[in-house]
């Protein structure tokens, strides 16, 4: 795991007190007329830094005045997670914010969005386009299907987060509403909307989701995870 757990109020204060940044990458031609401050990184004819620090440098360009600005946020309070030390498979295009915990051998697929304070257990897969809202918790060896949503709760600070147990399978495009707990070993059918807590070892389906059966050998076989996909 990679981060120190924060409760809702601590996350709110983290965001409120964070320096808001508009990070940019600027490729320019010509010579800078002024020295580069320590807050800006210059590599050849490329500048990296906050726009408020980079913009004055561009105004002082001499000779050619051509430059291209690349940016992906404005006044952002929470940076993206530094993934270099995480012992998991994270595919291109996943958006993971800072203060997220990711367990060993987890898998985060393309297009997944994971907000601040979320926790992902070891061996769990977050499939393509799935969304884990703020403080959402998923246990070990679970699978959150493509397009599924685990609602987040940063505000109100008193609200309880979504908690998903171990060995849970959440089907594609399912939605789990704020504060709901999914018991270990259970299955949420594709497209279900879960508005109430789900006990362990059951299958729920529908809108709103209802228990349709207990887990049996056939269900376990159909929903078994593939360890090979979690090999690093």
From Swiss-Prot:
Pathway annotation from the record: Amino-acid biosynthesis; L-lysine biosynthesis via DAP pathway; LL-2,6-diaminopimelate from (S)-tetrahydrodipicolinate (acetylase route): step 1/3
Keyword Amino-acid biosynthesis on entry: yes
Reactions it catalyzes: (S)-2,3,4,5-tetrahydrodipicolinate + acetyl-CoA + H2O = L-2-acetamido-6-oxoheptanedioate + CoA
Oxidoreductase recorded as keyword: no
Key words of the record: Acyltransferase, Amino-acid biosynthesis, Diaminopimelate biosynthesis, Lysine biosynthesis, Repeat, Transferase
Top enzyme class: transferase
Family annotation (InterPro entries): DapH, DapH_N, Hexapep, Hexapep_transf_CS, Trans_hexapeptide_repeat, Trimer_LpxA-like_sf
Record EC number: 2.3.1.89
Biological-process GO terms, alphabetical: diaminopimelate biosynthetic process; lysine biosynthetic process via diaminopimelate
Tree of life domain: Bacteria
Gene3D superfamilies found in the cross-reference section: Hexapeptide repeat proteins (2.160.10.10), Malonyl-CoA ACP transacylase, ACP-binding (3.30.70.250)
GO molecular function, one term: tetrahydrodipicolinate N-acetyltransferase activity
Biological function: Catalyzes the transfer of an acetyl group from acetyl-CoA to tetrahydrodipicolinate.
Similarity comment: family membership: Belongs to the transferase hexapeptide repeat family. DapH subfamily.
Protein name, UniProt field: 2,3,4,5-tetrahydropyridine-2,6-dicarboxylate N-acetyltransferase
Organism: Streptococcus pneumoniae (strain CGSP14)
Gene: dapH
